[in-house]
């Protein structure tokens, strides 16, 4: 079994970092449609996410902004990937993670693949379901904090988001040690 893992929200200034681990039950018919979540339109991501969830074993992990502040974004990213794999509760012969660094995963073979979210189908799938899940979380937070335009910026440091922070203040879910805050 091959597991792909990716994270989203690393460059955000609001909310958690979120990762997903994906193992396909069998080679899916939609495999050629997969791509890095950042390259797909929202509708296509959501469509593919539902197909991925139906046709794979998967797990998620969220690392809070408070933990990110304590251990830094790099370590939080690795922890998110490690935790997603642990939440999967499968023993995979090969675990492929997006990026340069290998998290502490107890599998026979773990490899970091630079640009893996554009190359490896399992990582592409993890990238898609993680992005859809985090975007939905930001949409929920937007209803609570509408002045910060989280539905639009998804927690990233856009001009509008930074202006909202200046005007309305820093929220408890903002990453306070981020240089922009």
Swiss-Prot record:
Cellular compartments annotated: Cytoplasm
GO molecular function list: manganese ion binding; RNA binding; RNA-DNA hybrid ribonuclease activity
Location of the RNase H type-2 domain: 1-181
Keyword Cytoplasm included in the entry's annotation: yes
Chief subcellular location: cytoplasm
Binding note for cofactor: Manganese or magnesium. Binds 1 divalent metal ion per monomer in the absence of substrate. May bind a second metal ion after substrate binding.
Catalytic activity: Endonucleolytic cleavage to 5'-phosphomonoester
A Pfam family this chain is assigned to: RNase_HII
GO cellular component terms attached to this protein's record: cytoplasm; ribonuclease H2 complex
Positions contributing to a divalent metal cation binding: 6-7, 98
Classification via NCBIfam families: PRK00015.1-3
Similarity field: Belongs to the RNase HII family.
Functional note: Endonuclease that specifically degrades the RNA of RNA-DNA hybrids.
Name the UniProt record assigns to this protein: Ribonuclease HII
């Amino acid at each position: 079994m091959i597991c792909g893992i990716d994270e989203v929200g690393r460059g955000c200034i609001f909310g958690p970092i979120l990762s997903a681990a994906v193992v396909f039950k069998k080679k899916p018919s939609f495999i050629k449609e997969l791509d890095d979540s950042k390259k797909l339109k929202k509708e296509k991501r959501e469509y593919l996410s539902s197909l991925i969830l139906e046709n794979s074993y998967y797990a998620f992990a969220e690392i809070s902004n408070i933990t990110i502040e304590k251990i830094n974004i790099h370590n939080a990213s690795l922890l998110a990937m490690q935790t997603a794999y642990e939440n999967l509760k499968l023993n995979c012969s090969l675990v492929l993670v997006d990026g340069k660094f290998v998290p502490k995963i107890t599998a026979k073979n773990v490899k970091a693949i630079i640009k893996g979210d554009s190359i490896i189908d399992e990582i592409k799938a993890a990238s898609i379901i993680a992005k859809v899940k985090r975007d939905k979380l930001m949409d929920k937070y937007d209803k609570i904090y509408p002045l910060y335009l989280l539905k639009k910026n998804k927690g990233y440091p856009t001009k509008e988001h930074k202006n909202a922070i200046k005007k309305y203040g820093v929220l408890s879910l903002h990453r306070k040690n981020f240089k922009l805050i």
